[in-house]
């Protein structure tokens, strides 16, 4: 394995990259020669990227195979994430898989940025797409497990009711940056009960539990780190509000108690995971509050 040419960097950065390289070599991992030209610039700019190369033995080959010249493609990203998550048999497996995917794609996004392959706009777009896809696929797995345990929530016509995850703030505007929390709201379209073997479970209870599991999968710090910090405080009634809210209750809240700042916040709201069609219907119901006619 050849050594990157980091000696042309300013002295302080050259020392930093040489230390990273020494630790990398000691780890016994290898990196494709095709990445060595950009490595000094990237590792000088990101301790995080250098650390990930020391932790993940397959990162270099994966990064090269990902075609760094191209921004993330939604279809291939979804396929990659879905394939890996399908192998998970427990919540611990799911957490490990999500964190591995997150770390690898964060490295890819930072590499493209620092190596001047992509620009700022492609970086924030890729970050937002990554968040959307990780959350949607994680939710799909958790929803399936929840339905296996307690049965599926159904609407009056017998169709499954799914959680709607609404993105707010920077994620809602597709402007997520490397240090952003993600602002979310959980909602569902129909109230009802799931008839179980022991006792009935309300849709509200089902979706609150599902939301808690999703937050735990994303936000909990494990040995592998975390996926995203989740902030739910923009939901109706803020921290004192229910974690998942029905469409009727949500519409009633904004009609009777919605404040001026909440109207501005809802401008960036968009359905980003779960039942996107139901989310679009919710947006239409809330539009009279957001865009009032005076």
Residue ranges and their predicted role:
Residues 1-294:
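A nucleotide- and high-energy phosphate-metabolite-utilizing enzyme signature
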């Amino acid at each position: 394995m050849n050594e990157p040419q980091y000696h042309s960097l300013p002295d302080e950065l050259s020392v930093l990259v040489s230390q990273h390289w020494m630790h990398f070599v000691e780890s016994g991992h290898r990196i494709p020669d095709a990445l060595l030209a950009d490595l000094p610039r990237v590792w000088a700019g990101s301790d995080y990227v250098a650390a990930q190369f020391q932790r993940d033995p397959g990162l270099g080959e994966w990064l090269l195979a990902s075609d760094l010249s191209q921004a993330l493609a939604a279809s291939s990203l979804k396929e990659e994430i879905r394939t890996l998550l399908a192998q998970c048999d427990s919540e611990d497996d799911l957490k490990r898989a999500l964190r591995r995917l997150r770390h690898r794609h964060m490295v890819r996004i930072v590499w493209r940025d620092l190596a001047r392959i992509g620009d700022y706009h492609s970086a924030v777009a890729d970050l937002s797409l990554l968040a959307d896809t990780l959350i949607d696929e994680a939710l799909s797995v958790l929803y399936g497990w929840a339905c296996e345990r307690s049965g599926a929530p159904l609407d009056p016509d017998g169709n499954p009711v799914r959680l709607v995850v609404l993105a707010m703030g920077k994620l809602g505007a597709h402007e997520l940056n490397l240090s952003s929390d993600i602002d979310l709201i959980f909602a569902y379209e129909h109230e009802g009960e799931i008839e179980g073997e022991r006792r009935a479970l309300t849709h509200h209870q089902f979706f609150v539990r599902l939301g808690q599991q999703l937050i735990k999968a994303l936000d909990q710090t494990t040995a592998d780190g975390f996926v995203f910090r989740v902030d739910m405080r923009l939901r109706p009634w803020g921290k004192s509000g229910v974690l998942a809210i029905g469409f009727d209750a949500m519409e009633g809240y904004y009609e009777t108690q919605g404040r001026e700042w909440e109207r501005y916040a809802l401008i960036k709201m968009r359905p980003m995971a779960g039942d996107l069609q139901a989310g679009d219907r919710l947006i239409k119901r809330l539009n009279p509050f957001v865009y009032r006619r005076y």
